[in-house]
């Protein structure tokens, strides 16, 4: 560089254009810019080029300093000082006339010359700064400024870069450069800002602390501009510019930024706000890099992206999300194009191939990313490399899933267009399912639907060409066809069944299967390998539905609609549809049982027992006139042949039961007579179809009981004036009853229980009236026996009812006596001797109450006796209560009564009731005998002595007297003295005053 060119000039405008050349006659000024607010964005000059800055000019002594080089300036300074000293000395000598005056003049003018020399040298840093400013302003690109250029200027003027003025100019240049490099708020970072700033800072030789101070000052300017902006939009732009400054500055200074850039302290921002600024700008910068790469990924670009991520200070998680989002958007572009073609109304056949082509691009792109994911140097590649997914994007919505299904269906159709599924296509379908995010069931449903159609088409072709029929192994042929289409053999079997069913429905369209139909079905079954079980199920369902419809039509008209034409149609259907008798009867049974249930519902909803029985009679008539004929026609039996009704036999266990014979003795003859009459009329009924599995046994028994009650009571006719007349019972009702039992599917035991229950109910009502007082006399026994025979109840059940009634009455009386306290142990033992079961009549709690009352009576009897065997053994045995629990009751009562007896004895003593005193003391001794006690305490010992004296006079036994002495705590000497002076003690006791 030629230092002679470093001359201050304000005649050359400065522009940020290509680097200057020393030989150029025209130089441009260096212009810098700060981010503008929104109010300045409307000005083209503010957005396209920074405002011009005027050059700096030298004034006064600065011009002289600029003319002199550093040595010349120093020499000039020396000359000035020396000249001033010499002039001062000369003037002092001339005017002062003495040596001292000469020296004074030399000092004075020397000082002035030194000041002038100092001023000349002090202006050098400012002159150097102005020349540096004007020199840089002449560059089109200030980044070409080097450290050597700055040193040349500094050396020319003999200044240091640390001089305040020179250093301030360097910082201003750096500030303008940083402000020009960082784009304004509305623009995004390009990614080269950090390198430019770092290189320029190095060129200037600026230390990190000084450079950091410049960054903070730029931040203050942006912060002030944000506060000065009046609109919200401008504030947002300034905030974004401030965020970019934070992001770029943190990268420029690296780890040192934590203490060199005090954003939080100076600008009162939080740590999270700083992190957000760094994160958002890093994301935008990395996203712009991804956008520039596009879909042309290779190993080198992925490595570059990884390096870019590191330079951007972007976390792996965010980089991974951005990469996946970029890949998803690329795939979404292909999907949108494919959907546009697929949904186009003017789409032609070539359009389908274009749709498939777009999907192939998606699959190829996905395969490319998967291959990079499996790379050995995956850590050196960009984060997020892997399978593409549409989750979180435009097509991750319920309303978009149908569009993806359309594309998936189109690709499946294309994959099967050749009549087979290639392995690579099958694998691609799985990848496409994962990319689209389709569920397993959704994808399988689409694949199954199209594969079924293709399989059915190829199956039809093989059948038409005879290829399948000529195959040696039809199962192997079909299996091979499934393998070519990747079709599940189980689904193929279901399709075969569907085809067979369709063929069967075509064959039975006219209501019967001809021999030709049977042969065709057999041939189809063999070719399709349809199992016999499946064939039977299909026949049972399809033919069964036809037969069921005919049966329903036959029975819908009721008892009068089953005519010859109906019979003919039933026979034709039963035999023409090739149904087995069991299958046909099973189908007919369902329809018939529904009609039975209808009659049952009507019977239940009827108001009275008679109306309910009439509905049941309709049920019986329907069974006789319709169901029986229907069963005959299904079985193929001739209606002209009389069908002898089988002899009704009851089950063996009932037939051998004595009670059963006694129960139906009176009804058997009527029943048999009615059956014979029915057989003479040639009317038979069938019990082939019953309600055994349709109604609970209890409900069926109730229906039977309803009709049985009707048979016993007969019809009731109401005539005017509220009079009811019972019609004479008809024997045929019992035949209907027998048929109803068969229709209901009741066993002989259940029927027997119903009959016996009614008999017991009738006998119980009459017996309760007769035994109202609970007394069973001989006359009443005879009367009850007569009633038993009339009703037909066995002796065993009659005795149980009688015993139950008498026992209930007696139990109520005994319970009342116990509650009122009128029942003692003597009476209880008399009842037990009379074989009265007290355990069932009297509850355990009441028996325990009796025991407690009995023990209480013993402790209050005044005898002073307690029989342990009686209380602990005999009484609990008679009452059938727990002995250990009884002992506990005795102990509790004895302990309570013991102290109470002493208190009662003292009270009676104070009342001078000597007899009562002896009575209470005997109770005390009885309680003590049951539960031995310690010596009792009493506050007034004289009263205890009086009690002993009074008891002594009652002439007790020595054992009782000795025990009482112990309980009252009277020693032997006192007892002897009391015996000797009993008369005087009594007289003294009469004179005492008792305070109550």
Swiss-Prot record:
A GO biological-process term: protein import into chloroplast stroma
Gene: TIC110
Domain of life: Eukaryota
Source species: Pisum sativum
Homology family: Belongs to the chloroplast envelope anion channel-forming Tic110 (TC 1.A.18) family.
Purpose: Involved in protein precursor import into chloroplasts. Forms a voltage-dependent cation-selective channel at the inner envelope of chloroplasts, which specifically responds to a transit peptide. Calcium acts as an effector of gating and selectivity.
Assigned GO CC terms: chloroplast inner membrane; TOC-TIC supercomplex I
Segments in the Chloroplast intermembrane topological domain: 93-100, 263-349, 632-702
Residue ranges of the TM segments: 74-92, 101-120, 245-262, 350-367, 614-631, 703-719
Induction: Down-regulated by cold stress.
Subunit architecture: Part of the Tic complex. Interacts with TIC32, HSP93 and CPN60. Interacts with the Toc complex components TOC75 and TOC159. Binds specifically chloroplast pre-proteins.
Main location: plastid
Domain comment as written in the entry: The N1 region (38-149) is sufficient for re-targeting to the inner membrane and proper insertion. The N2 region (150-269) may act as a start transfer signal, but it cannot direct proteins to the inner envelope.
Transit peptide: 1-37
Regions of this protein lying in the Stromal compartment: 38-73, 121-244, 368-613, 720-996
Post-translational modification, as annotated: Contains at least one interchain redox-active disulfide bond.
Comp. bias (Low complexity): 1-18, 38-50
InterPro entries with a match to the protein in the record: TIC110 (IPR031610)
Location in or out of the cell: Plastid, Chloroplast inner membrane
Protein name: Protein TIC110, chloroplastic
Annotated region described as Disordered, given as residue ranges: 1-57
């Amino acid at each position: 560089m030629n230092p002679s060119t470093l001359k201050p000039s304000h005649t050359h405008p400065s522009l940020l254009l290509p680097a200057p050349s020393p030989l150029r006659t025209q130089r441009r000024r260096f212009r810098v810019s700060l981010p503008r607010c929104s109010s300045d964005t409307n000005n083209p000059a503010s957005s396209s080029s920074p405002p011009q800055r005027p050059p700096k000019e030298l004034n006064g002594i600065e011009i002289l300093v600029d003319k002199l080089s550093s040595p010349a300036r120093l020499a000039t300074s020396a000359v000035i000082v020396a000249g001033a000293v010499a002039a001062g000395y000369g003037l002092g000598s001339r005017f002062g006339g003495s040596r001292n005056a000469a020296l004074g003049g030399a000092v004075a003018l020397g000082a002035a010359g030194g000041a002038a020399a100092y001023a000349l040298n002090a202006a050098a840093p400012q002159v150097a700064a102005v020349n540096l400013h004007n020199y840089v302003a002449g560059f089109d690109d200030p980044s070409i400024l080097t450290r050597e250029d700055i040193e040349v200027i500094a050396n020319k003027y003999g200044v240091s870069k640390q001089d305040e003025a020179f250093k301030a100019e360097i910082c201003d240049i750096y500030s303008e450069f940083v402000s020009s490099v960082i784009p304004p708020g509305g623009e995004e970072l390009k990614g080269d800002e950090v390198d430019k700033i770092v290189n320029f800072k190095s060129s200037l030789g600026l230390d990190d602390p000084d450079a950091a101070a410049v960054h903070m000052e730029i931040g203050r300017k942006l912060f002030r501009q944000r506060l000065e902006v009046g609109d919200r939009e401008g504030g947002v732009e300034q905030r974004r510019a401030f965020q970019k400054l934070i992001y770029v500055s943190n990268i420029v200074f690296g780890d040192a930024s934590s203490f060199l850039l005090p954003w939080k302290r100076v600008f009162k921002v939080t740590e999270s706000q700083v992190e957000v600024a760094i994160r958002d700008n890093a994301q935008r910068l990395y996203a712009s890099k991804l956008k520039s790469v596009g879909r042309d990924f290779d190993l080198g670009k992925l490595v570059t992206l990884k390096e870019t991520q590191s330079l951007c200070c972007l976390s792996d998680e965010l980089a991974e999300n951005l990469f996946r989002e970029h890949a998803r958007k690329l795939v979404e572009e292909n999907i949108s194009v494919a959907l546009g073609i697929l949904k186009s109304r003017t789409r032609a056949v070539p359009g389908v191939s274009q749709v498939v082509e777009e999907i192939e691009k998606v699959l190829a792109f996905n395969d490319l990313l998967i291959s990079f994911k499996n790379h050995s140097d995956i850590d050196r590649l960009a984060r997020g490399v892997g399978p593409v997914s549409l989750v979180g994007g435009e097509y991750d919505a319920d309303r978009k899933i149908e569009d993806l299904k359309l594309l998936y269906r189109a690709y499946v159709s294309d994959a099967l267009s050749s009549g087979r599924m290639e392995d690579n296509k099958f694998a691609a379908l799985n990848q496409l399912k994962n990319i689209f995010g389709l569920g397993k069931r959704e994808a399988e449903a689409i694949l199954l639907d199209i594969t079924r159609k293709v399989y059915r088409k190829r199956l039809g072709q093989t059948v038409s060409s005879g290829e399948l029929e000529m195959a040696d192994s039809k199962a192997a042929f079909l299996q091979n066809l499934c393998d070519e289409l990747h079709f599940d053999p189980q689904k193929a079997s279901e399709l075969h069944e569907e085809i067979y069913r369709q063929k069967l429905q075509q064959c039975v369209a006219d209501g019967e299967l001809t021999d030709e139909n049977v042969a065709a079905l057999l041939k189809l079954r063999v070719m399709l390998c349809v199992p016999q079980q499946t064939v039977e199920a299909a026949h049972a369902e399809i033919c069964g539905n036809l037969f069921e419809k005919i049966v329903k039509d036959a029975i819908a008209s009721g008892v009068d609609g089953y005519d010859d034409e109906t019979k003919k149609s039933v026979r034709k259907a039963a035999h023409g549809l090739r149904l087995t008798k069991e299958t046909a009867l099973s189908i007919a049974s369902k329809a018939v049982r529904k009609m039975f249930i209808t009659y049952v519902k009507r019977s239940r909803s009827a108001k009275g027992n008679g109306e309910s029985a009439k509905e049941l009679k309709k049920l019986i008539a329907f069974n006789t006139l319709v169901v029986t004929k229907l069963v005959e026609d299904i079985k193929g039996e001739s209606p002209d042949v009389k069908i002898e009704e089988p002899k009704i036999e009851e089950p063996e266990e009932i037939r051998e039961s004595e009670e059963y014979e006694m129960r139906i003795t009176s009804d058997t003859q009527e029943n048999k007579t009615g059956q014979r009459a029915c057989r003479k009329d040639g009317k038979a009924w069938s019990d082939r179809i019953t309600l055994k599995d349709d109604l609970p046994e209890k409900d069926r028994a109730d229906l039977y009981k309803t009709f049985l009650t009707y048979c016993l009571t007969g019809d009731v006719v109401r005539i005017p004036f509220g009079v009811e007349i019972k019609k004479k019972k008809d024997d045929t009702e019992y035949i209907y009853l027998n048929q109803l039992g068969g229709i209901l599917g009741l066993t002989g035991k259940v029927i027997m229980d119903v009959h016996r229950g009614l008999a017991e109910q009738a006998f119980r009502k009459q017996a309760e009236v007769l035994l109202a007082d609970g007394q069973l006399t001989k006359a009443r026994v005879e009367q009850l026996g007569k009633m038993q025979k009339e009703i037909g109840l066995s002796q065993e059940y009659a005795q149980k009812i009688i015993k139950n009634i008498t026992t209930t009455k007696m139990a109520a009386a005994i319970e009342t006596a116990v509650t009122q306290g009128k029942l003692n142990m003597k009476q209880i033992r008399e009842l037990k001797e009379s074989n009265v079961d007290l355990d069932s009549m009297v509850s355990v709690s009441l028996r325990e109450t009796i025991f407690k009352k009995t023990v209480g009576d013993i402790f209050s009897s005044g005898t002073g006796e307690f029989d342990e065997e009686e209380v602990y053994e005999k009484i609990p045995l008679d009452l059938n209560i727990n002995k250990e629990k009884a002992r506990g009751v005795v102990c509790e009562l004895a302990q309570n009564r013991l102290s109470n007896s002493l208190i009662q004895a003292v009270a009676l003593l104070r009342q001078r009731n000597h007899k009562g005193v002896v009575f209470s003391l005997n109770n005390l001794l009885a309680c003590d005998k049951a539960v031995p006690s310690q010596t009792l305490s009493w506050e007034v010992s004289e009263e205890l002595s009086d009690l002993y004296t009074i008891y002594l006079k009652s002439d007790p036994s020595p054992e009782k007297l000795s025990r009482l002495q112990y309980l009252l705590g009277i020693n032997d000497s006192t007892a002897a003295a009391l015996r000797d002076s009993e008369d005087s003690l009594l007289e003294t006791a009469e004179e005492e005053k008792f305070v109550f």
